[in-house]
Every structure is written in structure tokens, then in C-alpha cells.
Amino acid sequence: GGRARMSAQCPVGLVGLPGAGKSKVGRLLAERLCVDHIDTDALVVEREGRPIADIFATDGEAAFRVMETEAVADALTHDAVVSLGGGAAATPAVRELLSGHTVVYIDAPHEELVRRTASKTHRPLLADDPSGTLARLRTEREPHYRSVATIVVESGSGPVDDVVTAIAQQLEHA
């Protein structure tokens, strides 16, 4: 069947703002393509044995970005769907790693991101002013997402399955 052709497209990177659904879409897309799903944030946590918030607090953001870049480099050697942390694409070394790969930017409307992240308390960057922070992050990061993306999909208020289907269809025709 089409499985070999699909996995030939891998790795596939997923980028987007917090709340875009990178992890959920990544998991479902990987299932659909019959490949592994790798979350670079989870990879860093596993390697370091502590939460990202701790790494930020103790070692600082720059140190975390180095760990993250290593995790991305490793993840991209696998036949997998790779969900990248929200800030990863802002790191030049990560953008370099992604060039030549299939990368999907999951673009969600501002209100949708605010709604999705409001219920989640584990996002240290969004604690005080989620809406303002997300707006600032979009301004900072969107140009990077668009520069690495080979596919852009919208993730609105509809079912996440629609997003997965849209990506799978574009991968087939890529």
C-alpha cells in the first residue's frame, strides 16, 4: 500500500505557537502514517531528568535552546513525525537542521490559542498575560515558522482530525 511512500516523506516536522496542537496533531498524524511520534520537549525532559521549567529557571533559556537543538538533530534522524517546542524555530541552528525537510506550520487563530492555553497551567511563559504573551510570541516567531514551513495548515475550532487529514493529503501530493 501507500505506507512506504508516506514514510519516505519522513521525518516531518511540526511547528507552531503554544496551543496550536503540535503534540496532539503530531501523535495522530504519526498514527496515520504508521511512524513514531517524537516530541522534542519530551526528549529534553527525558534526557535531563527534570521539567523544562526547571531547566529554564536553573540553567537559563540559552542552555535550554542548546539542549533543544540537540534533541531536534537527533529526532530528525528518525522516520518520525517530530513536534518541535514553540520557540525552537527561533533558533538559527534549528532552522538550519529543518531546511530540506518537510515542515508543517500549524497556524491557529489568536482567540483559539488563548482558549486552548487558558486551561493549561503548565506553560511557564504564559502565566501572567496569556493573550498579550501569545500576541508577542506570534510577532516574534511567525516569520520563523513561515520561513521553515513547506506546508501551512489552519487549525481552527473544528476537529483536530481535520487538521491531520489536511496535512496527510498535502504530504501525499508533495
Specify the residue positions occupied by each region the protein language model found.
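NTP-dependent small-molecule kinase module
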Residues: G2-A8, L28, R32, E140-A174
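Hydrophobic anchor at the beta1->P-loop junction of P-loop NTPases
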Residues: L14
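P-loop (Walker A) phosphate-binding loop of NTP-binding proteins
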Residues: L17
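Conserved lysine of the Walker
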Residues: K22
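Hydrophobic positions on the alpha1 helix immediately C-terminal to the Walker A/P-loop
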Residues: V25
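ATP-dependent small-molecule kinase phosphotransfer cores
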Residues: D39-L97, H122-R123, S131, A135, ...
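Short glycine-rich anion-binding loops that position phosphate/pyrophosphate groups of nucleotides
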Residues: G86-A89, P109-E111, G158
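A glycine- and Lys/Arg-enriched "phosphate-lid" helix/loop adjacent to the NTP-binding pocket
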Residues: G100-H144
